[in-house]
């Protein structure tokens, strides 16, 4: 039987994986180019998106050892994990409100969300040893992995359907559907 902490650990993957599928992999890069950076030259918007991701990941590269060391010597793992998750959830929700042409705002909030998502995942992985033991660590990890695919995939399918048939969902355009998809990721993630 799994502990409540192990079940919560497994469920969380179903929520935050929606960010990876809907935002990172599917909609943000395309929407950045077509909505927020549509007035820029193709090479420029591609470069800006690349730089935004690079900066976010470099900050993660340089801060992760400090986050890891801090959580090793203090009882801040859950606090930081919750904080990173909350900041990422709010940053993704903000994407809904950013108007067309505001590429810098979109890139900043995406960069914050991406950084906090990845930093939170580092702590999430670290917590596996806290919610499991030698006999069930592989099973709990596998359940989390599977539930992440299930949760992220399910919301992505709904979001993809929203962009294919926005009128079916009461939306006026594909752009509105994508914006609602960002908001749905925040809600989905919060629920898990």
Which positions does each model-derived feature cover?
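Helix-loop boundary and gating motifs at the non-cytosolic
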Residues: 1-57, 104
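Glycine-rich segments within core transmembrane alpha-helices of 12-TM secondary carriers
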Residues: 138-163
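MFS 12-TM fold signature
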Residues: 53-56, 85-92, 148, 188-192
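Central cavity-lining transmembrane alpha-helices of secondary-active solute carriers
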Residues: 23-27, 46-69, 90-91, 153-156
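Cytoplasmic helix-loop-helix junction between adjacent transmembrane helices
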Residues: 109-146
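A membrane-interface helix-boundary motif in multi-pass transporters
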Residues: 40-48, 77, 143, 160-187
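Cytoplasmic membrane-interface "Motif A"-like loop-to-helix N-cap segments
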Residues: 71-87
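C-terminal ends and interior cores of transmembrane alpha-helices
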Residues: 61, 82-103
């Amino acid at each position: 039987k799994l502990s409540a902490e192990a079940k919560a650990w497994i469920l969380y993957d179903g929520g935050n994986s929606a960010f990876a599928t809907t935002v990172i992999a599917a909609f943000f890069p395309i929407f950045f180019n077509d909505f927020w950076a549509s007035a820029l030259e193709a090479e420029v918007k591609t470069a800006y998106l690349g730089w935004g991701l690079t900066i976010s990941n470099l900050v993660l590269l340089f801060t992760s050892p400090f986050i890891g060391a801090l959580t090793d010597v203090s009882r801040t793992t859950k606090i930081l994990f919750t904080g990173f998750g909350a900041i990422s959830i709010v940053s993704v929700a903000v994407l809904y409100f950013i108007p067309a042409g505001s590429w810098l705002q979109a890139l900043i909030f995406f960069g914050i969300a991406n950084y906090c998502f990845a930093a939170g995942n580092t702590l999430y992985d670290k917590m596996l040893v806290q919610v499991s033991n030698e006999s069930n660590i592989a099973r709990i990890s596998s359940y989390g992995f599977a539930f992440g695919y299930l949760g992220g995939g399910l919301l992505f399918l709904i979001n993809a359907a929203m962009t294919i048939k926005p009128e079916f969902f009461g939306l006026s355009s594909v752009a509105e559907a994508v914006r609602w998809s960002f908001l749905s990721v925040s809600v989905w993630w919060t629920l898990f």
